[in-house]
Amino acid sequence: MKKRIVIISICIAFGLFWSYKEAVFATFKSIDQYELNKELKNKSIETLTHKEMKQVGEHFVTAQLSVFEFHNKEDVKRKGEEIFVSRGYEQLIQNYYPNRFRDLEYKFTNEEIREVTDESFLYHAVAYVAGTENGKRSEIKVNYDVKVVKVNNIFRVLEQKQYVQ
């Protein structure tokens, strides 16, 4: 009987560890580490691997969160046109706080790829963005659902939802 309790306890402990391992072991990286290489940019959605879909999703989330560092609205507008199929400025202006953050870094947990078709996929993740705000390090946690499509041979965000925690 004691053996059974020990085995069950070990299984529960392992299950708890496994569910939190991503958050514990994920490390912050700078935005340049989330850029897409040329080979990946040239792939079609139907040929992307699961890992590559995550890379594309991470790229778009970091590009959106980078707006926290921007100093003028024209940069926000340009970034919106670069990322979104339409209405990019409206999406990004929500994250625009001029001169608020510096030295941003990003990490991701709970990444999932959902609703994969030949034309699109849905990327879900919890993103953490950390940076210097008024001389102190601040961290924000944001849940993202990003629908990625390829338009004119360029990956773009068709729609997204974000929830700040």
What residues fall within each predicted segment?
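Polar/charged side chains located within well-ordered beta-strands of beta-rich proteins
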Residues: 64, 80, 111, 160-162
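Exposed beta-sheet edge and beta->alpha loop/turn motif
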Residues: 118-165
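Hydrophobic membrane-insertion alpha-helices, especially the h-region
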Residues: 6-21
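Core segments of small alpha/beta cavity-forming domains
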Residues: 38-102
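A short, amphipathic edge element
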Residues: 95-116
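Positively charged n-region of N-terminal signal peptides that target proteins for export
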Residues: 1-4
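Sec-dependent signal peptide cleavage junction
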Residues: 18-34
